[in-house]
Amino acid sequence: GWNWHAHHNAADRPMAWIDGLDIPFQYVTESQFFEFGRDRISDAERTTPERSRSERLWGHPGLRPVSALGAQTSSPLLAYRWADTDRALADQLALEAEGHADTVEPGHAAVRYTNPTTGGDVLPTIRVEMHRVRAGAETAPCRETGSSVYQVFDGSGRITVGDRSWSVTRGDLFVVPSWTPFSARSEASASDSDSGSLDLFRFSDSPIFEALRLDRSDVERPQA
């Protein structure tokens, strides 16, 4: 995505994070470059405010600053807060319980993180989503062009990729290769999940396939 980024931990204990990168695509297309950044990160940059400058400018749902109406290639919003994501997923499932068809499928809520200047994906080469599968629910087997990486953000369940199935819990990572059937069953409960559901963080290279008009998906819906 041609975006500078740095790694540092200002906390007093170790941390771990996931780097969602488009390096495999750049490697295959021989378009990968490496450049050194600055030698030093300023003290101000090492301090994380309660609300960053980007959030104060861009983090207002449905609103954008008139001082910055132009489209930007990647999202200027540097933090997407979990409280907002959690509320959006919970509201989708609540609306479903009220009889509204506002989820991806029964028991499966999902949101996509977007670039507030375009409404499109946060990066031109990477799509980022959060999925919530209600306890006891199972997603329909789906296959798509493009590859995805999932992290179990919360809860537990059993996932099936192709002809293999295994149990997952919070912190687990797994990959779904292109055009490989994938489904997830939530086995979460209040004892292992704050929401009582299986929460899956996903990033994929779908924007690349859509730009090349090579996107395709197929969902196995249950027979009526």
Q: Each PLM stretch: what is its role?
A:
Residues 35-36, 42-125, 129, 216, ...:
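A short, N-terminal "cap"/entry segment at the start of jelly-roll beta-barrel domains
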Residues 4-6, 112, 128-132, 149, ...:
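Conserved hydrophobic/aromatic beta-strand scaffold that supports enzyme active sites
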Residues 188-195:
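Intrinsically disordered, low-complexity terminal tails and inter-domain linkers enriched
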Residues 119-125, 129, 134-151:
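Catalytic core of non-heme Fe(II) oxygenases with the double-stranded beta-helix
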Residues 2-58:
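Contiguous mid-protein beta-loop-alpha structural module that forms a pocket-lining wall or clamp
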Residues 1-10, 17-18, 22, 161, ...:
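Conserved metal-binding segment of the jelly-roll/cupin
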Residues 131, 201, 206-210, 216-219:
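Non-heme Fe(II)/2-oxoglutarate
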Residues 1-3, 138-170, 185:
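A short beta-strand-loop-beta hairpin characteristic of the jelly-roll/cupin
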